[in-house]
Regions:
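Short, well-structured beta-strand/strand-turn elements
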Residues: 73-86
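C-terminal recognition in membrane/secretory proteostasis and scaffolding
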Residues: 1-12, 28, 36-38, 127-156
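Conserved P-loop NTPase
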Residues: 90-93, 101-129
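Generic beta-strand/beta-sheet core signal
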Residues: 1-2, 28, 54-56, 79-81, ...
Length: 156
């Protein structure tokens, strides 16, 4: 999910449901306090293998919903840097002359009730790129993910 700026809520929920078979996947809370919980659907597809998810400051919106759900349920280790923090639902209200007003109408919460908006998802293991890493084209986040994944597999 590193560099993934978002997408559709339905896709994030579909992927989360591959790892989480029961419980809340995300909550949508409106300005009036109305809360809608998107629940996992019971499937026989639950993935139980070790999983690492890479995130960074460009991971936003639907990718934060997915990484937040996986983190809250301990279904994946999240590695990288804090995500962007775009956890809001917006609606475009059409205006004259083919213009529109983008109005925020609700916010997303992780399964444990953490507000994503302006806060982002903090990784389980923070790994930042240094200028040297960048100049040497060294992907320290991916290297860390491989190392952690090998340790996770060895424990099983």
């Amino acid at each position: 999910l590193r560099g993934n700026t978002g997408g559709l809520l339905t896709n994030a929920v579909f992927v989360a449901n591959l790892f989480i078979e029961k419980g809340r996947l995300v909550s949508i809370v409106g300005r009036n306090g109305y809360r809608y919980d998107v629940m996992a659907r019971d499937t026989d597809l639950e993935i139980k293998k070790p999983v690492i998810v890479l995130v960074n400051g460009a991971s936003a919106s639907a990718s934060e919903i997915l990484s937040g759900a996986l983190k809250d349920y301990h279904k994946a280790k999240i590695i990288g840097t804090k995500t962007y923090g775009k956890g809001m639902v917006q609606k475009i209200i059409p205006l004259p002359n083919e213009t529109g007003l983008n109005l925020t109408i609700a916010k997303y919460l992780t399964p444990k009730g953490k507000d994503i908006n302006k806060k982002g998802i903090s990784p389980d293991i923070e790994v930042e790129f240094t200028p040297k890493d960048i100049s040497e084209r060294k992907d320290v986040q991916l290297e860390t993910a491989k190392y952690i994944l090998e340790k996770m597999i060895a424990k099983k």
